[in-house]
Regions:
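Short, Asp-centered acidic motifs that coordinate Mg2+ and/or phosphate
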Residues: 94
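Glycine/threonine-rich flexible loop motifs
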Residues: 103-112
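Proline-centered loop/turn at the N-terminus of a beta-strand
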Residues: 2, 29, 125-127, 162
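A cross-family phosphate/adenosyl-ligand binding-site feature
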Residues: 3-6, 13-86, 90-91
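Alpha-helix C-terminal capping segments
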Residues: 83-89, 116-127
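Glycine-rich phosphate/pyrophosphate-binding loops
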Residues: 122-144
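Short beta-strand segments
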Residues: 6, 33-35, 97-100, 131-132, ...
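Electrostatically charged, flexible surface regions
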Residues: 143-167
Length: 167
C-alpha cells in the first residue's frame, strides 16, 4: 500500500518526519509531498496556479525515511491532487495529513489545510486521515503517530472515499 503524507505546517515539521518514519515502519510505501511553507488555514484551496506561476517543487531528504520527500510551493490539497495525478509516482492508496500543530474540531475544520488535504483525497476515491494535536508542552508527536498507525488498518478496510479526522 502506498501512503502520501502531507500537512499544512510545512515540509520541515518534525511531526511530519516522525509520522513518515512510523508509517513506513508499519509496512507502507511512503511518499511525502508537503508545502514548502506554513500553509495553515488554507482549507482545501489549491492556491494560485497560472502560466506565469507554475507549480514548483524540490526533492528533500527526511532522516530515517527510505521513501521520497518533496517540498511543493502550494497548499496541502494541491499536494494531494498532484500526487493523485502521478507527479510523484504511483497514485496513493491513502492520504495522511498531519500531525497538525493544534486541534481541528468544530468549524475550524472548514479552514484547516490538514483536513483539506484529506478531503481532497476523497474527491478521487482515495481514503484520507487528518491528524491533529492540542498539547504543545511538549508536542507528543510519537503518541499521535502511534494512534495514526493503529487507525490505518481499519481505515484501509473501510470503503473508498472514507475520511477520518483524529484529534
Amino acid at each position: 500500500m502506498r501512503a502520501l503524507l502531507t500537512n499544512d505546517d510545512g515540509i520541515d515539521s518534525p511531526g511530519l518526519h516522525e509520522l513518515a518514519r512510523q508509517v513506513e515502519a508499519a509496512g507502507f510505501e511512503v511518499v511525502v509531498v508537503a508545502p514548502s511553507f506554513d500553509a495553515s488555514g488554507t482549507g482545501a484551496s489549491l492556491g494560485h496556479i497560472s502560466r506565469e506561476r507554475p507549480i514548483h517543487y524540490e526533492k528533500r531528504q527526511i532522516a530515517g525515511l527510505k521513501g521520497d520527500a518533496f517540498a511543493l510551493d502550494g497548499p496541502p490539497a494541491l499536494c494531494t491532487i498532484t500526487s493523485h495525478l502521478g507527479a510523484f509516482g504511483r497514485r496513493p492508496d491513502v492520504v495522511i495529513s498531519g500531525p497538525n500543530l493544534g486541534l481541528n474540531t468544530g468549524r475550524s475544520v472548514l479552514h484547516s489545510g490538514t483536513v483539506g488535504a484529506a478531503l481532497a483525497a476523497q474527491n478521487f476515491g482515495i481514503k484520507g486521515l487528518a491528524v491533529s494535536l492540542a498539547v504543545s508542552d511538549p508536542w507528543h508527536f510519537d503518541t499521535a503517530c502511534q494512534y495514526t498507525v493503529d487507525l490505518l488498518g481499519p481505515l484501509m478496510e473501510a470503503p473508498d472515499r472514507c475520511v477520518l479526522n483524529l484529534n
